[in-house]
Amino acid sequence: MRVITLSGITLFLLASLASAIELTFKLENQEKQCYYLDSFHTGEKTHFTYAVQSGGSFDVDYMIKAPSQKTVALGKKRRQADVFFTLEEKGEYEFCFDNHMSTFTDKIVTMEITMENELSLPALTRDEAKDYKKDSMQSTVLEISTALSEIDRVQNYFKTREHRNYSTVKSTQARIFWFSLAESIMVVALSALQVFIVKTFFKRSGRRGV
């Protein structure tokens, strides 16, 4: 089992904090990989998503565990998953992927974890706090951030579909090639068998005539 600790780039946008981690890795046959993410705050909204890009039936098992070993989410033989949850504990969250159902096939998996946490406003008077909340620049930045996140999610979706379709096309081409080769060998073998039968028939007929 392979264990990796994740670290991401944290972006501060005015009164909100968002961090995102994206990783593409190879999950070999009969292998289990676990990734660990440190949570220093509770209440953070987290979005976990993954998709199998190529390999076999494009499916793996996954499991998310809290620091207390409580199961947050799990799935069996899933091609992809979108999980939204809130970090309720401090410590290491565990994200595991299991490919034990595949005896020979390796998988390419893309995983992304996005966390958002609203920070408390600075100590201001009531009127200043109202003006701060209504600040148009903050609203614009938050709207742009939301729109960019949605665009990124859509792009990842189409990228995953493209990888899967490409892998399916390659697999189909390989099957067509081997099927055509086997068919050609069978045609040649049947032709040779027919020639052999005809020759044998005429040889026997010639002997009887003599």
Swiss-Prot record:
Residues 1-20 form the signal peptide. Residues 197-210 are cytoplasmic. It is a single-pass type I membrane protein. PROSITE patterns: GOLD. Keywords: Endoplasmic reticulum, Glycoprotein, Membrane, Signal, Transmembrane, Transmembrane helix. InterPro entries: Emp24-like, GOLD_dom, GOLD_dom_sf. Glycans are attached at N165. SUPFAM superfamilies: Supernatant protein factor (SPF), C-terminal domain. SMART domains: EMP24_GP25L. Residues 21-175 are lumenal. GO terms for cellular component: COPII-coated ER to Golgi transport vesicle; endoplasmic reticulum; endoplasmic reticulum membrane; endoplasmic reticulum-Golgi intermediate compartment; Golgi apparatus. It is found in: Endoplasmic reticulum membrane. Pfam families: EMP24_GP25L. The chain crosses the membrane at residues 176-196. Its main location: endoplasmic reticulum. GO terms for biological process: endoplasmic reticulum to Golgi vesicle-mediated transport; Golgi organization; intracellular protein transport; protein retention in ER lumen. Residues 32-115 form the GOLD domain. Belongs to the EMP24/GP25L family. PANTHER family: TRANSMEMBRANE EMP24 DOMAIN-CONTAINING PROTEIN. This is Uncharacterized membrane protein C17A5.08. It comes from Schizosaccharomyces pombe (strain 972 / ATCC 24843) (Fission yeast).
